[in-house]
Each structure stands twice: as C-alpha cells, then as structure tokens.
Amino acid sequence: MSMNIAIDGPAGAGKSTIAKKLAKELGFIYVDTGAMYRAMAYYVLTNGIASSDEAKIAEACQDVDVTIAYENNEQQVILNGKNINGFIRTEEVGNMASATSVYPVVRTKLVELQRKLAESTDVIMDGRDIGTCVLPNAQVKIYLTAGSKTRAQRRYDELTAKGVSCDFDEIEKDIIDRDYRDMHRETSPLKQAEDAVLVDSSEMDIDEVVEAIRSIYEEKKSC
C-alpha cells in the first residue's frame, strides 16, 4: 500500500519548498498540484480566455492534457506535450490559477490525475485541499501556514533576488485577497482537515519545518 503525505495551506506558506525537500529525504515522489492548476491557468491566459468565462474554460479543459514527468529528479509540468515549467511561476499565472480553480470542471480533471498518482506511489502532495478533498485518506496530513506579512516578505525577497521590481504592500494585499478567495470558494475551500497537524512556519526556517513534519511522519508510520 502506498504512503501519502498531504500538505495544505495558504499561498506563500512554503508548501512547495518544504514538500520537495521532504520528498527527497524520504524517497517519495513530489507532486506539486498547484503547478498543475498553474498549467491550466497558463493555457487560459495564452488563449485569451477571461477568468470569468466559465463556459470557455470548460471547453478548454477538453483540450488540455497536463502531465508530470521527472528529469534529473526534478518535476517537469507538461502541457499538451510542451514543458512549461519556466512559464508558470509568475504572479499573473498564480492569480489566474486561483480564479479558475473555483470551477468544478477544472478541479475534476486535475484531481483525477492526482489520485491516480497517489494510488500506486508514495507521494507528497501540496495544495489547498489535498487532505480534505484530493487525498482524504492520506496517512499524514499537515496544515502549513504563516502570517501574511511573513509570506509577503518571503515572496518579496524571492522576486527581488531575481531582479524583479515589486511592491511589498501590493504583494501582501494579493496574498490576503487570495486567502479570502481560496477560503470562501464554493468548491473545496481552503481549510484545515480535522485530522491535520497545524505547523506555523512564521518563526521557523526550512530545515526546522522539514524536521517537524518528518517527526510527525515517523510517529504516524510507527502507529
């Protein structure tokens, strides 16, 4: 039987960074579900479809094939046969992913692939509703969070390190707005699963968070 670890939490909490490092340490496959939603959002953006046009987005779902491949132990997101890893981490794509993920047709298509992966493989998945919806039977569930200012600072530092000009207050506002949308959407809103362990990373570095989650995993595994 495969072992599944679900890591949920708001944007900018460090889910992807933590999940990747933990997966490497444990020898699990890391599945960045957010990247799959970003792939769908990238398709919507590049085809000039408005985030409010549910009918056209539903049509787009029929034309979209999102798969995951691994190259040098790094996850690659493939959209209709093209590697789009280098195009899906912008703020524009992130905001579109949040806006389009509210549509059931988008979520249905991507959740099906995510569950298929988890059935046969030891995986770590991170997202907004992994423990509550995608993998409700995951043996380990984590709700990873941090204050909005902490998350905004991390994003600001990440962007400025890449030479991208940005405004801290605008980044924090985007984060707060996305939190609200994700927590209040009708389908699978962001919330902590009843059996998830809360980990607040506001005052923790990456290694400390990884160690905390690994300890939770080892404890669950021994039960």
Regions found by a protein language model. Name each.
Residues 69, 114-120, 128, 132-133, ...:
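Small-molecule kinase domains that catalyze NTP-dependent phosphoryl transfer to phosphate-bearing small molecules
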Residues 4:
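Walker A (P-loop) ATP-phosphate-binding motif of ABC ATPase nucleotide-binding domains
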Residues 11:
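The conserved Walker
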Residues 7:
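Hydrophobic anchor at the beta1->P-loop junction of P-loop NTPases
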Residues 25-89:
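N-terminal phosphate/diphosphate-binding loop that engages ATP/GTP or pyrophosphate donors
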Residues 85-97, 101-162:
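ATP-dependent NMP and nucleoside kinases share a basic, alpha-helical "lid"
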Residues 18:
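Hydrophobic positions on the alpha1 helix immediately C-terminal to the Walker A/P-loop
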Residues 15:
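Conserved lysine of the Walker
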